[in-house]
Amino acid sequence: MKKIFLGILLLLCAALCACAPREKVVIILSTNDIHAQIQNFPQLATAVAECRDTASVILVDAGDRWTGNAYVDQAEGRRPGLELMHELGHDVATLGNHEFDVGQQTLAEAIDYCRFPVICANMVSENSPIPQLKPYVILDREGEKFAFVAAVTNYGYNNHPDGHDAIFEGLRFMDAVRTLEEYEYLRDSCQVLVALTHIGSK
């Protein structure tokens, strides 16, 4: 599935870049479920660079950045993957359920280490080392404003992402769709409103 996704991304990026003039073109690229597969970053970097040659790019990540590569998963703060995302130029990211696998303290440190904002509108930090994240960011590209509002699944047991209850202590997760709807007002001040989510197809 990961190879199929990467192939589709490469083809889509090439097609968009081939026909897109530089002026007033903004391409939004999203990575998702990377699962620490850092061996795929060279191909991904090539695809992103080709798009940037002909258009303005916003690069986002929809969660599950680790759990899947022993080297990355044992590294301090999962930094090898984050460093590659810094090099790739990610603009914003949200949380997936596997971000919590590392424990709340490690996740908090990883969020602090990121050079891009990590956002999530439906996670409430009540008694957790994880900071209360901003619900959205607004990015300017080609004179237009792009708002990204983020949410993570709460469809697991006890209304939190999939995982053991213990790793979510001190956190509360509101309904993702209802929370996203609260930010419809951003349409009044932005030209584009994007839901950056890790909520599956439900």
Where are the model-predicted features located?
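Positively charged n-region of N-terminal signal peptides that target proteins for export
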Residues: 1-5
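Acidic, metal/ion-coordinating pockets
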Residues: 19-202
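Bacterial N-terminal signal peptides
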Residues: 7-15
